[in-house]
Amino acid sequence: MQVLIRCLEWLALGMNRLAAVAAVLMSLFVFLGVVMRYFVGAPFAFSDEFIGLLFATMAFLAMPLGLVMRRHIILDIVTRGLQGPLRHFVDIGATVILTTFCAWFLALSYDFADYSRLLDARSDIGSMLLWPWMAMLPLCTVVMVLVSLGQLFDSLRQLAGRPSLFSLAGEEEVL
């Protein structure tokens, strides 16, 4: 199980690096669009669509690392005062809720991307093929489901008094 957790951590790190590349490309196209608007009179015709697709790609590629590091949004106003087994039970419940949501989102986003592929959907102005961009949603969600299942297993281990298998989570976030 430890090897699987390490692989998921490395995959999340790699996805985060790709998210950084998408962010740099997005910034570059915004900058080029502004420069071209002043010197040429208009930006690339497809730049607004491309920037939107890069933004969605960046956001979804960055999510798994946030989950691995437990740096996502949490409601700690309730759990801040909890200690010991009760805190682990709350963490297990939260992980089950997240896993359920991700599985549901995975099914819907897969159908969405597949239907886009069947229609050969393209963007309005740039006529860019959309289904590869839409496929990022279910692909990233699969990784999130795997990470949350790993965290569920890890929380059960910690409930039994064993140390966490996740090395990227900070000491204060590990329950």
Enumerate the predicted regions with their spans:
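Alpha-helical transmembrane segments and membrane-interface helix-loop junctions
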Residues: M1-L175
